[in-house]
Amino acid sequence: GLGDVYKRQVQFWADKETGCSKNFWLRSTGWYLMALVDCIALCSEQLYEHYRALVDIFRESIRGVLAYRAEDGLFYQVIDHPEAEGNYTETSGSAMIAYSLLKGVRIGVLDAEKYLPIALDVFEKLAANKLRAEEDGVVRLTDICWVAGLGPDKNPQRDGSVAYYLSEPKKSDDSKGVGPFIMAYSEYLRAKQA
């Protein structure tokens, strides 16, 4: 079946048994969580079986990622290797997680009593730690991984290793961070007004 396609090792960077990448890159996890919560929000009762499956996957994924929350309240560029030299709490993926948590609470698939305080805290820590005023008064959104990815085999540097993910440059005000930050902020405002 289709599931077998995802288990096969088809890329040079993939684990030969699982077909998965060796490590967990934060922004890819953030994209996944955002896609899940946005699809859940669009599902109708006619798709109830699929809706329940998506909700279960979303909840499990949220529990999993929260286990790796950093001391500053955000999430590392390589999620499960906080000890790696040069690893840092990355802005775009942390914003995506904040958005996913806040929207998950708002649409009722995450328990508000348990997850709303966490969701609010992630966003507040994101704003406090990653919005920085420059000497000229311009406020910048910092520590955004500029670009990362896997493959192709013509570019073996993009091998999914911790070293690779941490070698990509950080930028300020990159749209891949600003967009999710604005989305998270809109959910934050809705939560605060509720």
Kindly label every feature range from the protein language model.
Residues 11-13:
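Zinc-dependent metallopeptidase catalytic helix centered on the HExxH motif
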Residues 20-21, 57-60, 64, 68-95, ...:
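Extracellular polysaccharide-recognition and catalytic grooves
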Residues 89, 105-194:
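CBM-like carbohydrate-recognition segments
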